[in-house]
UniProtKB/Swiss-Prot annotation:
Keywords: Cell membrane, Membrane, Methylation, Transducer, Transmembrane, Transmembrane helix. It comes from the Bacteria. Induction: Transcriptionally regulated by sigma-D factor. It is found in: Cell membrane. The modification Glutamate methyl ester (Glu) is found at E271, E530, E537. It comes from Bacillus subtilis (strain 168). SUPFAM superfamilies: Methyl-accepting chemotaxis protein (MCP) signaling domain. Residues 269-302 are annotated as: Disordered. This is Putative methyl-accepting chemotaxis protein YoaH. Residues 202-256 form the HAMP domain. CDD domains: HAMP, MCP_signal. One of its GO terms (biological process) is chemotaxis.
């Protein structure tokens, strides 16, 4: 598998995981906000029903007060409370559009209309016939209130209480489930990203280190050309290892050929030096050994030509080495380009991580809105508590008035006690609502903290991506070092080429001198001094050739082949 394919696979997996986290978070938060809006509406509905209960109780108390004291203020109070009940029923219709509540609302309206009509009859009849007014109040009107209005309101109130509790339980359960889901998905994504990144780095660094070690040994160390780079990967590094092994094999053949040629050059130079000394020592007897000198010159010329041919072959081999070195440099540049592509892909993954970080911030803002809504619910429950306390105070006042009325106020005292109990129950319910709201606020704050944990995990993912980018930069630096070392090998090869060219030039010069000596053999007797001088030059050239051959052999001995 190619390195590029591995990188794209890892990035795709991480991006899919991140999108999954963001999508699930947005879905969960949207669902929670929707449920809270529904809870808010129902609690507002509940508040209006409680208000209707309170006004109905006040209306009944005002009617009893009117019958006892004949105070017109009670009549005005009854009218105001009746209007408040009708307004509350209208607000309830605006708040709730569900058909399941319509029948309850209609029952309350019908019963209250009947109750209000009887209430007005009591007020009208009291001025002319107080006894009739009391009969209506404690008879038919009381029956409608006890069997019609109050049960209808209480039934709807109990139903709303149960639905509010169920909705709160559902919101709490959804919050816990979303928290667990986000933590699990985030943990799996982080672990998967770390494992895949380690696997990718291992598949890159192991073959790269092996190749780099071999190149260092060739450039600065043992120069062992028998070693092979073993890379089982089928990616760019596997291809690079195969190319490198082919290069070392070709280089081994070239070094062997150069070694053989240098040995021949050394042997030829030694023979040439020996011949020159022999010619010099026998220059005084040149006339008697003319034929021997001619034979030696012929042999010397043949050996010089062979040396020239060997050196030419050596020069061609070194040129091939230089060409192969250039190819390796091109491969190193290609490897550097691949690493740069990998670095850009990791940077793209880093941008995706930052996008998810912004999405989690948006989710946190949604939860902050939820906390604000629960605070508003808490204010509403506080208002209910205040109303219940006022009702309790009114009940106390009614009990005092009943005590003052004596025997006639006993029934009114019983009603006042019932009102007080109802106010206490309302106060307890309001306190319970405040407790539940506080629980929701605490859970919301905990969810906000969990989102902060998610943000920290995303930040860790960003840091990990930045570290991966640093590792790619380190790979690029290593590739640059490999390229530099290959360039040093190319420079050394160029120096070797220059040395061989000097040897070639010297051998050609020697060949030319040998031919000239052979051509002038017949005139040696007349120019023995010139021949001695020529033999000195030949001896010097042979020594130079021998020295160059030794230097070439020293360079070759650096390689193990």
């Amino acid at each position: 598998m190619k390195v590029k394919t591995k990188l794209l696979g890892i990035i795709s997996i991480l991006v899919v995981s991140i999108i999954g986290i963001g999508g699930s978070s947005v879905f969960m938060i949207s669902s929670t906000v929707k449920k809270n809006e529904e809870l808010k509406d129902k609690m507002e509905f509940q508040k209006e029903i409680k208000h209707i209960q309170y006004e109905l109780t006040g209306l009944s108390n005002d009617e009893r007060g009117f019958l006892i004291t004949r105070d017109k203020e009670y009549d005005e109070g009854m009218k105001g409370k009746a209007d408040d009940v009708l307004k509350s029923l209208d607000r309830v219709n605006d708040l709730i559009d569900e058909e399941k509540y319509q029948s309850n609302i209609e029952d309350i309206k019908t019963s209250f209309t009947q109750y209000r009509a009887l209430n007005q009859q009591v007020v009208t009849a009291y001025s002319s016939n107080p006894k009739k007014a009391e009969t209506i109040h404690f008879g038919e009107e009381r029956t409608i209130r006890k069997e019609g209005v109050a049960p209808a309101v209480n039934k709807l109130s109990d139903r709303l209480d149960q639905e509010v509790e169920d909705l709160k339980d559902e919101i709490q359960g959804n919050g816990k489930m979303s928290q667990s889901l986000i933590i699990i998905v985030t943990g799996i994504s982080v672990i998967l990203g770390i494992v895949l990144s380690i696997m990718l780095l291992k598949s890159i660094m192991v073959p790269l280190r092996s190749i780099n070690k071999q190149l260092e040994e060739i450039a600065h160390g043992e120069a062992d050309l028998t070693k092979k780079v073993i890379v089982k990967n089928k990616d760019e590094f596997g291809q690079l290892a195969q190319s490198f092994n082919s290069f070392t094999h070709s280089l081994t053949q070239i070094v062997k050929q150069i070694s053989s040629s240098s040995e021949q050059v050394a042997a030829s130079s030694e023979e040439l030096s020996a011949s020159a000394e022999e010619s010099k020592s026998t220059s005084e007897h040149i006339s008697r050994a003319m034929q021997m000198a001619a034979d030696s010159n012929v042999k010397q010329s043949s050996m010089t030509e062979k040396s020239a041919e060997s050196i030419t072959e050596l020069l061609d081999s070194i040129s091939s080495v230089a060409s192969n070195t250039g190819n390796i440099a091109d491969l190193s540049s290609s490897m550097r380009d691949k690493a740069e592509i990998g670095s850009k892909s990791v940077n793209k993954m880093l941008d995706q991580m930052k996008f998810i970080d912004k999405s989690v911030d948006s989710a946190g803002n949604g939860l902050q809105t939820l906390v604000a809504s629960t605070a508003e619910i808490s204010d509403i429950s506080s208002l209910i508590t205040t109303i219940s306390e006022q009702t309790n105070l009114l009940a106390l006042n009614a009990a005092i008035e009943a005590a003052r009325a004596g025997e006639q106020g006993k029934g009114f005292a019983v009603v006042a006690e019932e009102v007080r109990k109802l106010a206490d129950e309302t106060n307890k319910s309001a306190n319970h609502i405040q407790s539940v709201v506080a629980t929701i606020q605490n859970e919301s704050i905990e969810t906000v903290n969990n989102i902060k944990v998610v943000q920290e995990n995303v930040s860790s993912g960003i840091v990990l991506s930045q570290e991966t980018t640093g590792n790619f930069n380190e790979i690029l630096n290593l590739v640059e070092q490999v390229t530099s070392q290959i360039q040093e090998v190319a420079a050394a090869t160029q120096q070797l080429t220059s040395g061989v060219e000097v040897i070639q030039h010297t051998v050609h010069t020697l060949a030319a001198g040998t031919k000239e000596t052979s051509a002038n053999t017949e005139a040696v007797a007349n120019s023995s001094q010139e021949q001695l001088h020529s033999m000195g030059e030949i001896s010097y050239a042979a020594e130079s050739l021998s020295q160059l051959a030794e230097e070439l052999q020293t360079v070759i001995n650096r390689f193990k082949y």
